[in-house]
């Protein structure tokens, strides 16, 4: 069975999609009450800054979705709510660098990292392999070593818009953190194809 390590797994949007495509999934996150309630797979509570990739060798795919709040325009200072930290790209880059070092040390067959487009203004060490929309309003960027043609075969705009509408985004703000299943399943299929080729 193919294996996925989902770093910064949150409530499991990516994990769920990969599991539905037959992957054995393990998630890692610092954790809060919402994650504990919603995450349905094997789980490791940990800070990515403290983990060593060497301890996680053997996974076929490692996925990372570092928090986007330090790069997102939705977190601009003029929109900052009381008690919420203002965006700090350097803080966000620390997590991205830690994830990339973790991946290099863990040496999976494939890795993918997802974040908001504005991240590319600050993280310039690698070029993204894909940018895509989740519905009409949320754009994302993907880095990794899965062959671009395998990913681009999927028609994200059609699949994602349908999936996006299923969520009650305004009523349950926590769902905003979830990557729609159609999206994560498409990436899981691309990874499965890549693993068959490798």
Give the label of every model feature segment.
Residues 4-52:
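SAM cofactor-binding core of SAM-dependent methyltransferases
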């Amino acid at each position: 069975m193919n294996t996925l390590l989902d770093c910064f797994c949150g409530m499991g949007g990516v994990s769920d999609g990969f599991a539905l495509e037959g992957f054995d999934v393990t998630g890692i996150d610092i954790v809060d009450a919402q994650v504990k309630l919603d995450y349905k797979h094997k789980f490791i509570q940990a800070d990515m800054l403290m983990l060593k990739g060497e301890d996680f060798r053997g996974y076929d795919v490692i996925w990372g979705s570092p928090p986007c709040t330090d790069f997102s325009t939705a977190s601009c200072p003029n929109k900052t709510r009381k008690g919420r930290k203002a965006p700090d790209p350097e803080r966000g880059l620390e997590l991205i660098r830690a994830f990339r070092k973790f991946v290099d040390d863990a040496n999976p067959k494939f890795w993918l990292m997802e974040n908001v487009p504005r991240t590319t203004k600050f993280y310039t060490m690698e070029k993204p392999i894909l940018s895509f929309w989740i519905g009409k309003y949320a754009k994302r960027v993907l880095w990794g070593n899965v062959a671009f043609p395998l990913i681009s075969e999927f028609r994200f705009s059609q699949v994602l818009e349908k999936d996006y509408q299923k969520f009650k985004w305004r009523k349950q703000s926590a769902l905003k953190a979830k990557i729609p299943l159609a999206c994560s399943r498409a990436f899981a299929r691309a990874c499965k194809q890549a693993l068959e080729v490798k």
